[in-house]
Amino acid sequence: MSSATEPVGVPPAEAPDIHTTAGKLADLYRRNHEAVHAGSERAVAKQHAKGKRTARERIDMLLDEGSFVELDEHARHRSTNFGMDADRPYGDGVVTGWGTVDGRRVCVFSQDFTVFGGSLGEVFGEKIVKVMDLAMKTGCPLVGINDSGGARIQEGVAALGLYAEIFKRNTHASGVIPQISLIMGPCAGGAVYSPAITDFTVMVDQTSHMFITGPDVIKTVTGEDVSFEDLGGARTHNERSGNAHYLATDEDDAISYVKELLSFLPSNNLSSSPVFPGAEVEEGSVADGVGDADLELDALVPDSPNQPYDMREVITRLVDEGEFLEVSALFAPNMLCGFGRIEGASVGVVANQPMQLAGTLDIDASEKAARFVRFCDAFNIPVLTLVDVPGFLPGTGQEWNGIIRRGAKLLYAYAEATVPLVTVITRKAYGGAYDVMGSKHLGADINLAWPTAQIAVMGAQGAANILYRRQLAEAAERGEDVEALRARLQQEYEDTLCNPYVAAERGYVDSVIPPSHTRGHVARALRMLADKREALPAKKHGNIPL
């Protein structure tokens, strides 16, 4: 085991005599040194000037000190086209191998922009394919560090073939081992499809770019003027497209996020997530374990159902130490997704955010949550759902862009999930959105509600206008105060149906609890569900509405 930036052995000052044992060893050290320093000093200096590290420096940042074991260090390309045979650096522009992160094994590849611009050729691709196969065989996560100009044009279709080999392995590994992509520079053309298939993509502000076709091609074909940053920058993919899951301020931040993310995940779909020492909920009455932070939940939900509150305040009071690692925080902010721990064990959190679009479900929020729920289900991570949803976002834009089909993805994700599912309704749960957000009817195991919950077909205002349309019209004809009557009828509807007790009477809610008792109830539910076993009907695969 070694550092990625330190070659094994000291290179000889002069050409060694390879006819002796000592000379052969010296020759090995020379080759190792050339492999580690494959990029020219000028290329490395340019990389550093952009605020970017080299491929090997990034591996050293990611892995535990001294844990890196390199593969194919001496591999070189075989191309003779366009004078390529005159320049055959060791490693061929990508560093591959394995090591540990916090003592847990991971496989890694890191593209080297200082060698051929990180372009992918046949040997380059074969090295990535080999380490992907190793990750699958050994059941460990794969971290890919991308910094590449794209396919190596000089090698022609061989490069394209290796891209497809990589895509195929990304697909086969999906749901088997966690796959994380770090975009540390350009990632263009067909190369973008590998990160797209992986589970999480992290980009660095101002230095990362992903796009199928670049600004110049777009200008030529469509006449549009767009910058690299606006077209495919880190902020664009975090805020607008949703292709990235974290916007890092720099490379240190990006790698720190990946290391923290790995701490919540199992090594593969047959193992369990790491369990850390956490604040355990004591046996006995749930009320006995209520602390000051828990009591703050009792006053969190405003009296007015139309006044927002921050759902993050709920999440941080339920998870250990208030630590919540959010995923896709800048995309579809009306839906919160991320990881926390309860009693030291990982849990995925899905929550409506009343501070954004009143917590409504739209296309982006539905797809964001659906992907997250499916990831948690694939890797046996329980899902905690916090519900405050007034419905689906209305509008022609949503309807014409496929909210029916795309919103159904979230329903599908919950219905096919077999991991422990615990749902807490904090306030609104209206109409079809109630069904979609981890309802008992879709298979949730434990459904809890706060006394502030309003579980109904629709809100009081809309319901009163429909139920009492004739009565309101007659009052208007008589010259009575229609608004006062409407307010009274709305209150009557709220008192009758907008509460958690109608659902509780039917068993759709297992218990109505004080907000301050939520952590205790959730912890006990997850403890009880730890050995849950559930099987779906036999099938090749379902047909999710893509």
UniProtKB/Swiss-Prot annotation:
Its EC number is 6.4.1.3. One of its GO terms (cellular component) is acetyl-CoA carboxylase complex. The gene is pccB. Residues 292-540 form the CoA carboxyltransferase C-terminal domain. Signal peptide: none annotated. Residues 21-540 are annotated as: Carboxyltransferase. It is an enzyme of class 6 (ligase). GO terms for biological process: fatty acid biosynthetic process. Pathway: Metabolic intermediate metabolism; propanoyl-CoA degradation; succinyl-CoA from propanoyl-CoA: step 1/3. Disruption phenotype: Mutant lacks PCCase activity. Mutation has no effect on erythromycin production. Residues 21-277 form the CoA carboxyltransferase N-terminal domain. Belongs to the AccD/PCCB family. InterPro entries: AccD/PCCB (IPR051047), AcCoA_carboxyl_beta (IPR034733), Acetyl_CoA_COase_Trfase_b_su (IPR000438), ClpP/crotonase-like_dom_sf (IPR029045), COA_CT_C (IPR011763), COA_CT_N (IPR011762). This is Propionyl-CoA carboxylase beta chain.
